[in-house]
């Protein structure tokens, strides 16, 4: 059964993932990535422009589909070897502000989960946000 997920990641890190065709969540932990399966969908929510910045964004910034079931490590620095998964991202999307998500009836359930960094959402919520992100 296909599942739908949200990952909470700063926009600059989302862009790296989209450009490289991969995802990372929860500061590179493998457990959350293993919960997703081939064919599952991921929305990225970016609270900020960059991890080390105070500049807020508060928007959904990318959407993609898990390509396979492989979770692997990748050395980004000698002391940072995070886990990743390969993702096929949708390229014809634009950021969707959090105000749009607040209009969905499930938002109150999901708003409190943003602090966890990765969580499952309903198909209906995913499609609501994804449709708002799609470029005409």
UniProtKB/Swiss-Prot annotation:
Signal peptide range in chain numbering: none
Record Gene3D superfamilies: ph1033 like domains
InterPro entries hit by this protein: EVE_domain (IPR002740), PUA-like_sf (IPR015947), UPF0310 (IPR022996)
Family: Belongs to the UPF0310 family.
NCBIfam families attached to this UniProt entry: PRK02268.1-2, PRK02268.1-3
Name by which UniProt lists this protein: UPF0310 protein SMU_442
Organism of derivation: Streptococcus mutans serotype c (strain ATCC 700610 / UA159)
Phylogenetic lineage: Bacteria, Bacillati, Bacillota, Bacilli, Lactobacillales
